[in-house]
């Protein structure tokens, strides 16, 4: 078969094991991990879905090696418990039966153990251990590990690696990056020891070397050992890329695959988990430089979801393997689609952090663009309907398109009506923001799915009660979306005012001095985008905080980007009048201020089109509202 991306689709052999292509599934934690560290059935299904989707390897995350000194959150595995080993075996089986290589990530959190515990066990009260005596930024004291404790942990890595092999895992990943224990020993910022484990680079690498030696002794030769580390810690006081190269050279004889990530979780979540504000493949330069200096295969990771970019990475020799995490939540079948030359059908990750925020908030996984995530046990196959019906969809936004596609796959006769000349609803506006192009492109993907499934799409067609009566559907799905909130502020009808939903149609009207009214998610992201273009942007928000509607993972990175791109933020300001000079506002003390700008963006929120819903609610035998 001739592949569209021949280098990405080419096999690679690592430690005697041949992988069918270069697309691997990175560690992503499960959600139903039990108190004794077992992988629950939902998590096993979560990993299995990536194997069904065609990933060459699927890594199960994160297995503790030494519970006495570790346990950073409620989703750690513990294979030393008999039931946990059985559950790990089931997970490995679930992965391997689809042709993927099951891998297990071994991790120790070190001084950050206990940070995210939710009273899963007594570990929330345990002492924090690290390379050196110190105090964490949150005030928690950390004690230096003794040599005896280090020996225990080293041996524990070997023991758990042996158990993983027994359970059916065919590859081991040692997590040596992102600020966890091995990284803490490697880092001059964390490691202040004066014995053989601290000081020189050779000494700081000693713990990692001993861990890798113990793992190799346990699993034997011709068993792939992967070392995941940060090519650079990306903060002052940590090691840089130059030292990252030397670390890689020190460790390469003990490993079979070097997995190059970046940053430390505690010092920069947006480095370890790149946000939409960063370039796709932002870590590739680290892997590319390190690859020049080692003789083993190198993997890269970091916001990768475009097969054309991944093909270039492999073809140019920047890396040998590409890892994806969130991209395989958005579309678990991405690797299979690439191998089948169907890359146009890939649903791309938005990097919105819904997946990670939901786990923090509710202990579940969810994905903005993939409703199957968190429901993997229900199966990904759409079952044919017992009774075929005539279905009418009112609204051609993402919700309406997805509903139409699903109904058509079930065998129904589906007509989708869109009152405008183009599909997409509110997503049409996202084309104005370069870092949200994936969201705009989602419309094209869903439209293709719907048309290929046989959906009839009618443009310039508004669904009214009379229209429903004429069409006489068996079922009506109302996906009317929302409309922008435009309050009657004096001057709102001025030529210099642009509603944020219409920004994409008015980019040529935007001057160099802009006032954005509204500090919600849409207003903040608009302000950031205009700031990136070099415009002088001021942000006005009536509340005392920006973007309270943003999720807990996205919001801190959003605010950091606001600091970089926006000239001034005015919270507690109520906009009262728009003039050619800017926006007159009143602060909490009743004082008036002019926020200067020659273009004003109105981003004051959206309101659901409940009027449409009420008109159509009882017009068909079966009605559902999205």
Model segments located where?
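Short phosphate-binding/catalytic loops that engage adenosine nucleotides
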Residues: 55, 100, 169, 295, ...
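Rossmann-like dinucleotide-binding cores of NAD(P)H-dependent redox enzymes
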Residues: 413-453, 504, 529-575
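A short helix-to-beta-strand connector/capping loop
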Residues: 318, 450-457, 493-496, 562-568, ...
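Short loop/edge segments at beta-strand edges and connector loops
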Residues: 443, 459-461, 499-501, 571-573, ...
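Flavin-dependent oxidoreductase catalytic cores
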Residues: 1-394, 398, 402-409, 510
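Short acidic loop-to-helix transition motifs that present clustered carboxylates
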Residues: 305-308, 329, 462-465, 503-506, ...
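Rossmann-like dinucleotide/flavin-binding elements
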Residues: 385-418, 423, 458-472, 479-496, ...
